[in-house]
């Protein structure tokens, strides 16, 4: 006889949008670490900005694996918008802060790649904000069929 056996603990629910967002945040954080080395040589203020941005992106990426929170999504969205705005200004009119205030910087390959990843991160975070799914390593929920079967059996 083929009987269903109740599962004591449900398998983790994998949320691909969380995995994508965590990946994009971590990748942009890594690119900001790479770019930050050159910017520290230009002026310590630029380097500190890149260091703070990369730390926030690494922490945000890690949190996205363990937590689903509207506040976390909003923080990521605001952070990505600020980074993209600063990048856009630095490539159009130039950043007029620091000892070597200069005109616009040229767009390089890593700049464009990082900007694209930031846009992808924004897209996924907005998607998560609109219809939140559990983070990959949050405590898994049992699916309704298993819960119904368990309640029928009196468990």
Annotate each predicted stretch with a short phrase.
Residues 2-155:
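Membrane-interface extramembranous regions
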């Amino acid at each position: 006889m083929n009987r269903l056996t109740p599962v004591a603990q449900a398998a983790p629910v994998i949320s691909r949008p969380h995995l994508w967002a965590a990946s994009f945040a971590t990748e942009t954080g890594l690119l900001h670490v790479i770019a930050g080395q050159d910017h520290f040589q230009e002026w310590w203020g630029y380097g500190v900005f890149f260091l703070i941005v990369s730390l926030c992106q690494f922490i945000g990426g890690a949190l996205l694996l363990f937590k689903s929170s509207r506040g976390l999504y909003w923080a990521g969205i605001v952070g990505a918008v600020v980074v993209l705005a600063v990048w856009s200004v630095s490539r159009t009119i130039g950043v007029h802060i620091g000892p070597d205030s200069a005109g616009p910087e040229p767009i390089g390959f890593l700049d464009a790649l990082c900007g694209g990843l930031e846009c992808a991160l924004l897209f996924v975070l907005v998607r998560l904000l609109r219809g939140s799914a559990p983070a990959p390593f949050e405590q898994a929920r049992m699916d309704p069929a298993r819960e119904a079967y368990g309640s029928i059996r009196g468990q």
